[in-house]
């Protein structure tokens, strides 16, 4: 039989030892059940970018001011080029594709949605959507494309040094070379009609450029300002008998309703020269300009650098497309009563005849 002193001294000690063993065992079990993906304390996380950040899904908000072939081509070129470089749609990139339907208020609401969703990057196609995105966020990187003059639009401080969270690619078209096409088609042309959206900076810049270029070529520009696509046909009709040709710049509102201009031009046998090739494919006679699909690809190359952490918008110069090409539409020329010069056909990069 144990003495009272032995029990008094020994039992508490044994209980303490047993408790210590239980606490240690529980601690080891807890450590062994930590998620395997947890990084050791103090270890830097992997840099952003496709294969370097395993398991990350990027969110890219894409907004264009309106849907028409040129802007659509820029969007599809961007997505295709991203996929070629490992950023595949619905695999490691989720695109939120939006159209503002020509309304600035819609563009602002969409940009606010992108900010609320915490998107990794915003692609703004055309000037108004880029302005809306910049107005909404100064933190999310914004890339624009199909913007004629980003400095005049107050998107960047300069073409060489944007200085903020915005950069991208410009679609500045060679206006003087395009107006020369009118003289090549109709040597006695003196007056050129230009319809444009008075609310888009992009368009005002091109009208001023057209006036300057026309002056050099011995022609004048007749302007017709509109505020909605429904006014395009009436504007074109108001110029009948006053102009020798129409010039359709890369004005998003007018391009989206170019069929209205073409209807008047074909009925009155007035040649139409466009600011970009998709308008020629839609029925204008010719253009000398850029490829919007390739412009989208070029913009994607910039996005890749941003997402991989290799560059920041503030330090990335605005890029332009180096190569221009002549595209002509033989069927459109026939409908407008114009004979295409053989010299123009011979140097064309693309001839549309069906």
Regions found by a protein language model. Give the residues of each.
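Extracytoplasmic "Venus flytrap"
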Residues: 47, 55-85, 96-105, 199-203, ...
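Hydrophobic alpha-helical segments within soluble ligand-binding/sensing domains
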Residues: 150-189, 291-311
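An alpha-beta-alpha
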Residues: 60, 78, 167-215, 318-332
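Hinge/cleft segment of the Venus flytrap/periplasmic-binding protein
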Residues: 308-354
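Beta-alpha junction/loop-to-helix N-cap segments that form part of ligand/metal-binding clefts
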Residues: 100-157, 248-266, 270, 275
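C-terminal motif of bacterial Sec signal peptides marking the signal peptidase cleavage site
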Residues: 21-25
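Structural motif
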Residues: 94-116, 224-239
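Bacterial signal peptide processing site
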Residues: 27-30
């Amino acid at each position: 039989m144990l003495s009272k002193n032995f029990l008094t001294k020994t039992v508490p000690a044994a209980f303490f030892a047993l408790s210590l063993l239980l606490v240690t065992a529980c601690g080891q079990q807890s450590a062994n059940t930590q998620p395997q993906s947890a990084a050791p304390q103090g270890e830097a996380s992997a840099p952003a970018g496709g294969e370097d950040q395993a398991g990350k899904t990027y969110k890219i908000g894409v907004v264009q001011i309106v849907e028409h072939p040129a802007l659509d081509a820029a969007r599809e070129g961007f997505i295709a080029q991203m996929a070629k470089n490992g950023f595949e749609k619905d695999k490691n990139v989720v695109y939120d594709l939006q159209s503002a339907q020509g309304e600035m208020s819609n563009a602002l609401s969409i940009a606010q949605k992108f900010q609320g969703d915490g998107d990794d990057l915003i692609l703004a196609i055309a000037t108004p959507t880029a302005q809306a995105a910049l107005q909404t966020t100064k933190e999310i990187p914004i890339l624009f494309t199909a913007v004629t003059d980003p400095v005049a639009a107050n998107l960047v401080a300069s073409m060489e040094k944007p200085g903020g969270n915005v950069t991208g690619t410009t679609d500045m078209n060679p206006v003087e070379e395009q107006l020369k096409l009118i003289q090549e088609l109709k040597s006695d042309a003196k007056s050129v009609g230009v319809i444009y959206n008075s609310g888009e900076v992009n368009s005002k810049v091109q009208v001023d450029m057209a006036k300057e270029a026309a002056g050099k070529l011995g022609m004048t520009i007749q302007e017709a300002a509109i505020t909605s696509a429904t006014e395009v046909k009436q504007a074109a009709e108001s110029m009948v008998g006053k102009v020798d040709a129409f010039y359709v710049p890369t004005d998003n509102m007018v391009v989206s309703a170019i069929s209205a201009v073409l209807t008047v031009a074909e009925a009155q046998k007035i040649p139409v020269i466009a600011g970009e090739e998709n308008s020629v494919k839609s029925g204008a006679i010719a253009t000398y300009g850029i490829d919007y699909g390739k412009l989208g690809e070029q913009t994607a190359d910039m996005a890749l650098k941003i997402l991989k952490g290799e560059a920041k918008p503030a330090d990335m110069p605005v890029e332009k497309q180096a190569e221009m090409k002549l595209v002509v539409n033989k069927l459109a020329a026939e409908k407008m009563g114009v004979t295409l010069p053989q010299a123009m056909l011979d140097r064309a990069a693309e001839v549309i005849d069906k």
